[in-house]
Amino acid sequence: MARIAGVNLPAQKHVWVGLQSIYGIGRTRSKKVCEVAGVASTTKIRDLSEPEIERLRAEVGKYIVEGDLRREIGIAIKRLMDLGCYRGLRHRRGLPLRGQRTRTNARTRKGPRKAIKK
């Protein structure tokens, strides 16, 4: 089992799929990382040699991933809330940000229904 960016990658999966278990690396970026590192994306993680794992680590290290990315996103949201702009207010109230309707729907963002008290 390879460990990259503080994440244990599943040994039985292909490299490009396993890299996606790192927060901040999706389908496109994982394929790009494999290509630049010179690793076949369809190789199973358990079959990787130590130099290949090191090349992947070096390539993933060029991106902001995992805890740093989560922190950066949190700081950006906090900044919006401190500014008091529309998006910040929507974050503060737990409502959708991008113009979706809220009279019906938006249950994921609003949470479970609250009964109306008479």
From Swiss-Prot:
One of its GO terms (cellular component) is small ribosomal subunit. One of its GO terms (biological process) is translation. GO terms for molecular function: rRNA binding; structural constituent of ribosome; tRNA binding. Residues 96-118 are annotated as: Disordered. Pfam families: Ribosomal_S13. SUPFAM superfamilies: S13-like H2TH domain (SSF46946). Keywords: Ribonucleoprotein, Ribosomal protein, RNA-binding, rRNA-binding, tRNA-binding. Gene3D superfamilies: 1.10.8.50, 30s ribosomal protein s13, domain 2. The keyword Metal-binding does not apply. Belongs to the universal ribosomal protein uS13 family. Part of the 30S ribosomal subunit. Forms a loose heterodimer with protein S19. Forms two bridges to the 50S subunit in the 70S ribosome. Located at the top of the head of the 30S subunit, it contacts several helices of the 16S rRNA. In the 70S ribosome it contacts the 23S rRNA (bridge B1a) and protein L5 of the 50S subunit (bridge B1b), connecting the 2 subunits; these bridges are implicated in subunit movement. Contacts the tRNAs in the A and P-sites. This is Small ribosomal subunit protein uS13. The gene is rpsM.
